[in-house]
Swiss-Prot record:
One of its GO terms (biological process) is potassium ion transport. Belongs to the HAK/KUP transporter (TC 2.A.72) family. Its main location: membrane. It comes from Bradyrhizobium diazoefficiens (strain JCM 10833 / BCRC 13528 / IAM 13628 / NBRC 14792 / USDA 110). Keywords: Cell inner membrane, Cell membrane, Ion transport, Membrane, Potassium, Potassium transport, Symport, Transmembrane, Transmembrane helix, Transport. This is Probable potassium transport system protein Kup 1. Transport of potassium into the cell. Likely operates as a K(+):H(+) symporter. Signal peptide: none annotated. InterPro entries: K+_transporter (IPR003855), K_trans_C (IPR053952), K_trans_N (IPR053951), Kup (IPR023051). GO terms for cellular component: membrane; plasma membrane. It is found in: Cell inner membrane.
Length: 657
């Protein structure tokens, strides 16, 4: 990424981990965004088909429950009326057009971070735009990301439950098997995550094309029976319903939001498919299919108000219910898979940005580096999903918990989007506010409507999100305290080199690489090696690993070396926050710059800290213990940076935190 010379120098954001071995610098260049259109090696239509299978799974399965829940909320126990149906349809239509189409598809998809999207990418883009540390943007990014994790638990539960619930309509005797079958499907889904999804991912696009085609045909048949339902296109019905129904209108608005959940995924998956394929898939296929189905459900309920109980499945003849249940189950599994994969990617980005400790990462594909599996995250999601299914039992109960997490993320995206439009795109503040403020107002309206369901279940994603945000806060705060304590005993590297030149220790052959967070000071492992072994290698490398504010960095920017004496060199390796750090592979690039790197004659020295809790650390004891637990759960630096274990020497120290 080019550096703006007018800025004078690159400004660094340092986020330190529990030991020097996995300290990471966040480096940002103050420069304008270079818009990328995502992968260009595959054909446009192949990418469009792929986006239909991955990006739109969540929002594409919303017709299973969104219209049903919204009309039930509007009726509030009373008979369903034409005014209610048209009001709900109009609200759904304009919510999809304003929140998803205008805000995400037409606006935020242009706010890419070197081709990548998502809440944390937007946060990093905003930080870069401001050119300084912004705790406000960091807080927004953390809240948005935390709520996405909560959403990642609810989406599989409500989607699969809604699909399997169709069995009750086909065969009432199967009603008692809905929850057990849902649990079985979800357990199998999470169990196969470690094997990767490469074998079945190619079928996601075609299956979802069949799904969207089917729901569009189902809707078109019923619209043909009662074309008057198309009157709901007029926004008058939406406004009239809200103004005339008071609190019930606000409650209904919370249920209508179910129709746009998953809209944020369009932005999160930007890097996988590119802007134009996602826009084409949404505008010309997915959006029309969804609207036709929603209006078809409306036409059905207008002709038979009792159909609202199972409005989606009642759209087909009885003998087609079971095949539709099968197709719906496949679609919801695909939607769940996309959300689970998104959670892995989000946590991985958080780790790279220093917001979480290094969790174990397994790569499930030799050809696609982005296909990863995080065992701890998988277990956490499985436990959360199982608890939701067993506690709430039905999609209607879960609907109360759904929405609050997504609406929170959307509000955060809107505010961070304003910063990017204002500072990075160089729009006038008033113009940027005029563009983004209406979207934030709409998002806040949905957020307020979902808050009304706090006691009915909305507390669940808020609890998950608060726990996640608390974990990130603890990790950041504990890391900061650890840095302060380390600073007090650190020795400047230049002072040590001068001292060693005057009184050189015994020199041994080979190269020693010392991982550190700050190359200006002596790595702890180097100090202990001199203190206990009383030797110095022929070549000593002080290695710093940085994470950029961009998803990827060019190979030309990966490696930088500075020779500071005959025996000492400083090396900086730089990775994007979506790249897997591979230290030996990156160091091999150094050969092109004249450094003869040989892995077999190189030893990597890693310092590992043993932490103890202290009431005087600045954090409450419970936070001390949480930070220590997070530190212990972190993956080894050798594994994370893919360093051969046979070439690693670990040096331990004890620190009171």
């Amino acid at each position: 990424m080019p550096i703006d010379r007018r800025a004078g120098s690159v400004k660094r954001r340092r986020i330190k981990f529990r030991d020097e071995a996995f300290s990471i610098h966040m480096t940002a260049s103050i420069t304008s965004t270079e818009t990328q259109e995502g992968p260009v090696t595959s054909g446009f239509w192949a990418l469009t088909l792929g986006s239909i299978g991955v990006v739109f799974g969540d929002i594409g399965t919303s017709p299973l429950y969104a219209f049903h829940e919204a009309v039930r909320g509007a009726a509030h126990g009373e008979p369903v009326t034409r005014v209610m149906v048209l009001g709900v349809l109009s609200l759904i239509l304009w919510a999809l057009l304003i929140v998803v189409t205008a805000k995400y598809v037409l606006l935020l998809l242009r706010a890419d971070n070197n081709g990548e999207g998502g809440t944390l990418s937007l946060m990093a883009l905003g930080q870069r735009a401001l050119g300084r540390r912004s705790w406000f943007l960091l807080a927004l990014g953390v809240v948005g990301a935390s709520m996405f994790i909560g959403d990642s638990m609810i989406t599989p539960a409500i989607s699969v439950l809604s699909a399997v619930e169709g069995l009750k309509l086909a065969t009432p005797a199967l009603e008692h098997y809905v929850v057990p079958l849902t649990v079985l499907i979800l357990v199998l889904l999470f169990a196969v995550q470690s094997k990767g999804t490469a074998l079945v991912a190619s079928a996601f696009g075609p299956v979802m094309v069949v799904w969207f085609t089917c729901i569009a045909v189902m809707g078109a048949v019923h619209i043909a029976d009662d074309p008057s339902v198309l009157a709901a296109i007029n926004p008058y019905y939406a406004l009239q319903f809200l103004l005339s129904h008071g609190t019930i209108g606000l409650v209904t608005l919370g249920a209508v939001f179910l129709a746009v959940t998953g809209g944020e995924a369009l932005y999160a998956d930007l890097g996988h498919f590119g802007r134009k394929p996602i826009q084409a898939a949404w505008m010309f296929f997915v959006l029309p299919s969804l609207l036709i189905n929603y209006f078809g459900q409306g036409a059905l309920v207008l002709s038979d108000p009792s159909a609202i109980e199972h409005s989606f499945y009642r759209m087909v003849p009885e003998h087609l219910v079971l095949p539709l249940v099968g197709l719906a189950t496949a679609a919801t599994v695909i939607a769940s898979q996309a959300v689970i994969t998104g959670a892995y990617s989000l946590v991985y980005q958080a780790v790279q940005l220093g917001l979480l400790p290094r969790f174990e990462v397994r790569y499930t594909s030799e050809s696609h580096a982005g296909q990863i599996y995080l065992p701890r995250v998988n277990r956490l999601l499985l436990i959360g999903v199982m608890l939701l299914v067993l506690l709430f039992h039905t999609p209607s109960n879960l609907a109360s918990a759904y929405g609050i997490a997504v609406s929170t993320t959307m509000v955060a995206d809107g505010i961070m989007g304003f910063v990017v439009i204002w500072k990075l795109w160089n729009w006038r503040a008033a113009t940027a506010a005029a563009v983004i403020l209406p979207f934030v107002v709409v998002d806040m309206s949905f957020f307020s409507a979902n808050l009304l369901k706090l006691l009915e279940g909305a507390w669940v994603p808020l609890l998950f999100g608060a726990a996640m945000a608390g974990t990130i806060w603890t990790w950041r705060r504990g890391s900061g305290i650890l840095i302060q304590k380390t600073r007090r005993i650190e020795v400047p590297l230049d002072d040590l080199i001068r001292s060693l030149e005057k009184r050189p220790p015994h020199i041994v052959k080979g190269t020693a690489v010392f991982l550190t967070s700050d190359p200006s000071f002596v790595p702890t492992a180097l100090l202990h090696n001199l203190k206990h072994n009383k030797v110095l290698h022929e070549h000593n490398v002080v290695l710093t690993i940085e994470t950029a504010h961009t998803p990827r960095v060019d190979l030309s920017e990966r490696f930088r070396m500075e020779k500071i004496s005959d025996k000492f060199s400083k090396v900086r390796l730089r990775f994007g926050f979506m790249e897997q750090p591979n230290v030996p592979k990156a160091l091999a690039i150094a050969r092109k710059q004249g450094w003869q790197f040989d892995i077999m004659s190189t030893s990597f020295f890693v310092s590992r800290r043993s932490l103890k809790a202290s009431a005087q650390s600045g954090m409450p004891l419970w936070q001390d213990h949480l930070f220590i637990a997070l530190s212990r759960s972190a993956n080894d630096a050798t594994d994370y940076f893919q360093i051969p274990t046979g070439r690693v020497v670990e040096v331990g120290t004890q620190v009171t935190i």
